[in-house]
Amino acid sequence: MNTKELIASELSSIIDSLDQEAILKLLETPKNSEMGDIAFPAFSLAKVERKAPQMIAAELAEKMNSQAFEKVVATGPYVNFFLDKSAISAQVLQAVTTEKEHYADQNIGKQENVVIDMSSPNIAKPFSIGHLRSTVIGDSLSHIFQKIGYQTVKVNHLGDWGKQFGMLIVAYKKWGDEEAVKAHPIDELLKLYVRINAEAENDPSLDEEAREWFRKLENGDEEALALWQWFRDESLVEFNRLYNELKVEFDSYNGEAFYNDKMDAVVDILSEKGLLLESEGAQVVNLEKYGIEHPALIKKSDGATLYITRDLAAALYRKNEYQFAKSIYVVGQEQSAHFKQLKAVLQEMGYDWSDDITHVPFGLVTKEGKKLSTRKGNVILLEPTVAEAVSRAKVQIEAKNPELENKDQVAHAVGVGAIKFYDLKTDRTNGYDFDLEAMVSFEGETGPYVQYAYARIQSILRKADFKPETAGNYSLNDTESWEIIKLIQDFPRIINRAADNFEPSIIAKFAISLAQSFNKYYAHTRILDESPERDSRLALSYATAVVLKEALRLLGVEAPEKM
């Protein structure tokens, strides 16, 4: 139980008109610490109690009695709580030194499954910075949900089907070079894809030719299937190399093609339930009662099924296969209307588990304010970007610590971590402008800044040869250490907020605050000096390191022991 929960619990025992949850929402942190650590505004009780808020505050303060509080005073309409810093710091340090990396573990999920649809790049196209967002947000959410007691299933729903394969086959047959593709598959396939899109703008017959080849592919034409399989296999080799760089793993690579033989069953169910309507030769599901103006287009007039039909088949397959408690789609916010339709159609089909489906949208990555586009060849490719980030990190590490033994390994952890952290510290629904120099900086609100704070603490602990005692009598009451204690105590609540909002940035911002607070503490306090507080200061340093490393792990970022 954290401090706010304790106060809410104490107050709920003497306030009849508000429950603990309602009180918790009303608690505030005073701007001036001289006014206490936490405040409860009595305004909300004035109408029910028919008394002035000042009088209510005075009565509540008088009734409060807990050893966790140094004092409780009424100041005007507020009840101000001054916490017992020594008692709370002892409790927090005891918890972290005992539980270590399992501090803040919870069992909210009771081992139920959370399916996370994430990354999902298109076959035969390069893995760009645009795909990075879905990959790192999904990976972080997987760690967060595991931390609170869920099992996760990470699904890479590959874009391995569609008219673009018709375009690619036409381009390859016209201009492709087998040896060049074998040597650099994605580079060569991207050149072909960009070229055919440019030429198709002036030559509409290329579009028709591509449609014809895609029809052949759908009908199982041997040549078309062989080329498609080749493009897919070569792309996956490259993707997996990048996923290894990012240290991201998947439980399933079932992409769009996997559901080719599962869509007719969806159409049959919709038909049996009388949900399909005829509209200009196409078959649709009307969703007006859900406030959705456009009907869901299930089958075109030429009999071709659509993207939503495939996603319906995927949703049914995943529910049947994994019996999920939550199914999360980490997909750009431009797809919001699609996912509203998906949920509404499942609801129409009578599946109440449609409520367990959540679209987790995210904003765009731009470069110098401009939108990125594979088709126009305006794209930031991840592989050279990672290499550049690692190189920049290494330059800074060599300047800071020329004697460091495993520079390459540390530079990789810092460079990759910098890119991930910068993405994840951004509120998910906001976009950001890609700036590698800012990402890899050791100053400011960056991954390397947090990693360096962790490495600095490890250096302090090595110098002191500090090993925490699980029964250690650690306690502090100074202002600088109190700021750190409050943050560490809040870590379980931070994780819950991140899970509830599908928002890793909450954890990234927490990690920045904790690193900043420790650096401030380090500047003010001689941690290694002989004093009665030395062991407690070292225990605080140790606890900070444990929580920083765990916060970074939840973001999929490594924490090097030395930098």
UniProtKB/Swiss-Prot annotation:
Q: What is its EC number?
A: 6.1.1.19
A GO-annotated cellular component:
cytoplasm
Recorded hits in InterPro entries, A to Z, give: Arg-tRNA-ligase (IPR001278), Arg-tRNA-synth_N (IPR005148), Arg-tRNA-synth_N_sf (IPR036695), ArgRS_core (IPR035684), DALR_anticod-bd (IPR008909), Rossmann-like_a/b/a_fold (IPR014729), tRNAsynth_Ia_anticodon-bd (IPR009080)
Entry's Pfam families? Arg_tRNA_synt_N, DALR_1, tRNA-synt_1d
Which is an annotated GO molecular function term of this record? arginine-tRNA ligase activity
Which EC class is this protein assigned?
ligase
Q: Name one GO biological process term.
A: arginyl-tRNA aminoacylation
Which family would the database say this protein is a member of? Belongs to the class-I aminoacyl-tRNA synthetase family.
Assembly notes: Monomer.
| Protein name, entry field | Arginine--tRNA ligase
